[in-house]
Amino acid sequence: MKFVDEAFVRVEAGNGGHGCLSFRREKFIPRGGPDGGDGGDGGSVYFVADKSVNTLVEFRYQRLLRAQNGQPGMGRLRSGKKGEDLIVPVPLGTTVYDKETSELIGDLIEAGDKLCVARGGRHGLGNTHFKSSTNRAPRRTISGEEGEARELKLELKLLADVGLLGLPNAGKSTFIHAVSKATPKIADYPFTTLYPHLGVVRVEEYRSFVIADIPGLIEGASEGAGLGVQFLKHLERTQLLLHIVDIAPLDGSDPVQSIQAIISELEQFSQNLSQKPRWLVFNKIDLLPPDVAQARCQEIINRLNWKGPVYKISAIKRQGTELLCYDLMSFLETNQRSI
């Protein structure tokens, strides 16, 4: 399931250090010649494709990327220190454009691909360079150049790592809203989600994954009923399915029958999809007393003879969602997608 994510960021390379105006001053050498050193080059900003980075979410928190300035030159022919380059990891498949001109700067396709997006300013020259037979005490220096600065647009075709399963109104949209920046339409009636929504879940710095909420499935979806059939095929590209189950349905329906209906649709649509790793997530546990919720969850597990991972959450109250997201991140890192 591919979606285009984008981010905007300003990059500023470091300025070059200025050249030094200095003369040799030592005992018994009253008229020492020039000894001003050169400045250091400014640091550049590089993007590097890193397979451990999945999304552009980091650029929502850091909109300015700045490399170090070069240090000025010093006396005794000492050069200034070069500014440190700024190396920024980006996901594989990132495309970089100049925001103002829409010029394509480059693509980062394979792990280790490196792209200079702002080059550091060239160092200035000390007065030593301007000594001549007619000018033994030059007072001329050259200042360091300014580093490049530009506004960039980054694009990434996202491949969803986790897909959400569940009947309409199971709470999938509420869940994706609770754990990510996605804002799907949420209401208490079936088919609230009319098209896929994508959310980026940020667990820690440079640890994030992509989760997709598709329209709720109903019985017969694999044959064209409801809204989910045209999106079922996209779930085959995900690594893991979260089966969201409403344990307190307002219509009094049986959660076990709801789960079995979804499983049946998966099996009819694709054997590969039905065998994909799937975790059971009981939602809306806040609507029941704790002992009743526990008993109902256990009853469902027993009736299904479920052997896989089980989580109990309240998406609307964000109860249990943090642990689930950390476990999802660990699973995805352990079973990293081959690109």
Curated annotation (Swiss-Prot):
The keyword NADP does not apply. Mg(2+) binds at S173, T193. Its cofactor is Mg(2+). Residues 160-333 form the OBG-type G domain. InterPro entries: G_OBG (IPR031167), GTP-bd (IPR006073), GTP-bd_Obg/CgtA (IPR014100), GTP1-OBG_CS (IPR006074), GTP1_OBG_dom (IPR006169), GTP1_OBG_dom_sf (IPR036726), OBG_GTPase (IPR045086), P-loop_NTPase (IPR027417). One of its GO terms (molecular function) is magnesium ion binding. It is found in: Cytoplasm. Gene3D superfamilies: GTP1/OBG domain, P-loop containing nucleotide triphosphate hydrolases. CDD domains: Obg. GO terms for cellular component: cytoplasm. Pfam families: GTP1_OBG, MMR_HSR1. Monomer. An essential GTPase which binds GTP, GDP and possibly (p)ppGpp with moderate affinity, with high nucleotide exchange rates and a fairly low GTP hydrolysis rate. Plays a role in control of the cell cycle, stress response, ribosome biogenesis and in those bacteria that undergo differentiation, in morphogenesis control. This is GTPase Obg. It comes from Coxiella burnetii (strain RSA 331 / Henzerling II).
